[in-house]
Amino acid sequence: MGGDPDRFGVTIAAFHHANTQRAKRWPRSVVTTSTHDTKRGEDSRARLAVLSEIPQEWAAQVETWSRILRAGRGEIGITAPPDRNDEYLFYQLLLGSWPVEGHFNGTYIDRLKAAMTKSIREAKVHSTWQSPNREYEGAVLSFIDDVSNSDAFFSTFLPFADRIARLGVQNSLVQLTLKLTAPGVPDIYQGSELWDLSMVDPDNRRPVDYDHRIHLLDQCKRISLDHWQDGAIKLFMTQKLLHLKAEGSYEPILAEGQKTDCICAFARQDVMVLTALYPARREADPDWFDTRIPVPPHLLGMNLRNILSGAAVHQEDARIAAAEAFRDLPVAVLVGDLQ
C-alpha cells in the first residue's frame, strides 16, 4: 500500500536530505516497513530488491521457468492462463515468499493460491470481486498445482531461490538497521520480529508465536550470518538497536574510495551507523579496496565499539576501513566511549 512504480528508488544524497529534514521537523513521525495492509512482507521485498541488481539474469530465469512449465502443460507460447503479467507476478510471489525451510507443502500452496486469486481480482483485468471469472482463476490455480509437481522447474528454481534468499538477508538487515536508527519512531508489525515473508493481506495477519520468539531471544548470545535461517539474527539486532535508542541530530557521512556508492552511513550524536548496499554486486566483487568511512570530528579520540558484534573498530587517519567495518555483517553500529 502506498507504493508508486514511478518512485523506484532514491539516491544516497536524497536519503540523507530526507532524514535531515525529518530530524529537524518531524522527529516523532512513524517509520514502518510492514503493516496489516502490506502487499508483501518486509523481508520478501528485501529479497526481490536483489533482482534489481541482476535484471538480465532474472529475465533469463523467468523465460526458462515459463518454457519448462508451459511445455509440461503441452502449451506453445503464452496462450493459456495465466497471462504474461500474472505469470510474472507468480514467480515474484514464489521467490519472495519461498519458505526458509524449503517446504512446498499443502499449507504453502493454499497460501499461494489465495494470494494469486486476490491479486487477479484486484487487478480487474481477468476477474473481479464483483464478477469472478472462475474459468480464468481455475486455470491459474491449476498452473500452481503443476508447478508443485514439476521436478524440472524446481531443479532450476531452487538454486536461484537459495541465492536470492541469502542475499536478501543482507538487504533485510540493512533495512532493519536504518529503520531503528534513522530519525523517527520505528513501528514493528506483529510477527515481523523474525523473517516476514508474508504475501498479500490477510496472509500477514496469521497468528504469531510469541513464545517461540521469547525462546529464540533467550538462546541467542551472538549473531552470525552463518545461521540466519531461524531469524534469530533479526530478533537479536532489533533488541540491541531498540536499547540503543539513537536520537538527536542527523549527520550524513560520505564514504571515500572506490566503492562509495555501496555505503550509506550517518551519525546520531555518539553513534555511527554504517550499512553496506547492493549485496549481489558485492558478492561478485567482494574487495572493498581503499574504501573508508570518515569518523565525525566529535567521535575522534573515542574508542569505537560495534554494539552488534561487540568488536572494537580501529580508526586510522580519522577513518574506518570498510573491510573492517563489514567483516562479519553488512551493517555496523558504532558507539563511542572516551578513552
Regions found by a protein language model. Give the residues of each.
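Carbohydrate-interacting/catalytic domains
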Residues: M1-Q339
